[in-house]
Amino acid sequence: MSLLSDRQKDDLHKAMLDYLYANNHTAAFNALKESAGITYTPDPTARYTGLLEKKWTSVIRLQKKIMELENRNAALQEELSMSPARRAASQADWLPRAPAAHVLTGHRAPLTSIAFHPQYSILASASEDTTVKIWDWETGEFERTLKGHTKPVNDLDFDHKGHLLVTCSSDLFIKIWDSQNEWKNTKTFVGHDHAVSAVRFMPGDQLIVSASRDRTIRVFDVASTHQVRTLSGHSEWVRCVIPSADGTMLASGSKDQTVRLWDPLTGEPKSELRGHENDVEAVAFAPISAYAAIRELAGIPNDRTKRHGLFLASGARDKTVKLWDTQTGQMIRNLAGHDNWVRALAFHPSGKYLLSSSDDKTVRVWELSTGRCLRIVEAHSHFVAALAWGRQAAGKSGSEKKVNGVDSVDAEPEKVVNVVATGSVDETIKIWLP
C-alpha cells in the first residue's frame, strides 16, 4: 500500500515522465505513460518540471552532510573517551539553544498553537489568519493548508495515533480533520456560545474537551459529535484546559485568575488553585518522570507513586509560572523571571526541566529540582505564543501501557524525540533541534 496521496502519485509520475522526455528516453517514456494512464504535456513552469534532478541533488547533499556529521560524531566520541570525567550531557538531557534549525513562514497573522504528530515528522500550526498549516519539521518544508474556520484558530491537538487532528476557533466551532483522508474536515462540533479557546483529545480518543470564552468547559463524543457534559464554575473566560495522562482529571485556567481541577466523568469540580494575579494562560500536568525532581523541590519524600496528575504547572499574565500539588491544592514554588505574560508550557521528557514561553520573546528553561532558571533562549522577534516538545510513542498504545490507569512496570517507554517548536506573533514557527 502506497503512503503517497493521489496528488503526490500524480506529481511523481509526471516528474518521471518529464525526466524521460527531457532526456529522449522515448520507449521508457511511452511505456510509463501508458502504464500510469495519465495525460502528460511538457510544461517548463509546472511544479514537477526538473523535480527528480532537484530531489537527487538534495539526497546527495544530505548524504554528504550525514558523512560530515558521522565524522564529527566519531571525533567527539574519541574526545569523550579520553576525558577523565566523561560527563558530557546525554541526548536525554538535550535542551534547545539558538539558533533555530528551521524558520517556517507562510502564516499571515500571529500563531496561536502548534502540535506535533505522534508518529511522523509532521507539525500542525494554528493561526489568527483562520487557517491550519501542516509542515514537515525535519526538512522545514510546508505541506498544505487546511481551510474551514472563518475566524482565528485558537488551538489544536492530535489523537494518540495521529489519525485525527482537532481544532477550535473563535467562530464557535470545533473541527476534526482526517490525516488519512487528505486532511478532510470530517466532523464539526457545536455547542459553545463564544470563542473556543482550547481543545484536547481525552486519553482513549473517544472524547474531546474544550474551553471557551463562554466560561464553560464542554466534553464531546468524537463518534457522534454530541455534547456529553458541560463543566461550569469559572466566572470568566476559560483560557486553557488539559486532561491528565490517565484521563481521571482535568485542569483549566481562566481569566478569573484561578486554576480549577475537575472530574471529567462527573463534571464535578475537585479543587480551586488560587495564587495568580492575572489571567491564567497555560496549564500542564507534570509527567511521572518529573515527580522525583518536584518532590525534591517541595522537600517531601519521593514515594515513587506512579499515579498521574499529582503535580501541575500553570503560567499566567502575571509573568509567573507556578507549580502545584493537586492533592493538597498547595503551591509548591513560584517561578519568576519572565518580563511579560507567560503563554505556554512544556515539560522536558526527562522530567528534569520545565520550559515556558512568554511575550518577553524568550523561552526559559527551569530546573525542577531547584526552581532555578538554567537557560534563556532568545526565540523570536515578537511574543512567543506557542510552545511544544516533540512526541513519539514507541510501539504500544496508551491503553496497553496502563493497568487500572497506572503505568505498568513492564510498559515500553516512550521514545524521546529531541525537537522543540515555537510559534510567535511574528507569524513564524521555529524548529529547535540538537
Curated annotation (Swiss-Prot):
Dimerization mediated by the LisH domain may be required to activate dynein. PROSITE patterns: LISH (PS50896), WD_REPEATS_1 (PS00678), WD_REPEATS_2 (PS50082), WD_REPEATS_REGION (PS50294). WD repeats lie at residues 106-147, 149-187, 191-230, 233-272, 275-334, 337-378, 401-434. The lineage of its organism: Eukaryota, Fungi, Dikarya, Basidiomycota, Agaricomycotina. Its main location: cytoplasm. Keywords: Cell cycle, Cell division, Coiled coil, Cytoplasm, Cytoskeleton, Microtubule, Mitosis, Repeat, Transport, WD repeat. It is found in: Cytoplasm, Cytoskeleton; Cytoplasm, Cytoskeleton, Spindle pole. This is Nuclear distribution protein PAC1. Self-associates. Interacts with NDL1 and dynein. Belongs to the WD repeat LIS1/nudF family. It comes from Coprinopsis cinerea (strain Okayama-7 / 130 / ATCC MYA-4618 / FGSC 9003). GO terms for molecular function: dynein complex binding. GO terms for cellular component: cytoplasm; microtubule; microtubule associated complex; spindle pole. Residues 57-83 form a coiled coil. One of its GO terms (biological process) is establishment of mitotic spindle orientation. Residues 8-40 form the LisH domain. Positively regulates the activity of the minus-end directed microtubule motor protein dynein. May enhance dynein-mediated microtubule sliding by targeting dynein to the microtubule plus end. Required for nuclear migration during vegetative growth as well as development. Required for retrograde early endosome (EE) transport from the hyphal tip. Required for localization of dynein to the mitotic spindle poles. Recruits additional proteins to the dynein complex at SPBs. InterPro entries: Dynein_regulator_LIS1, G-protein_beta_WD-40_rep, LIS1_N, LisH, PAC1-like_LisH-like_dom, WD40/YVTN_repeat-like_dom_sf, WD40_repeat_CS, WD40_repeat_dom_sf. It comes from the Eukaryota.
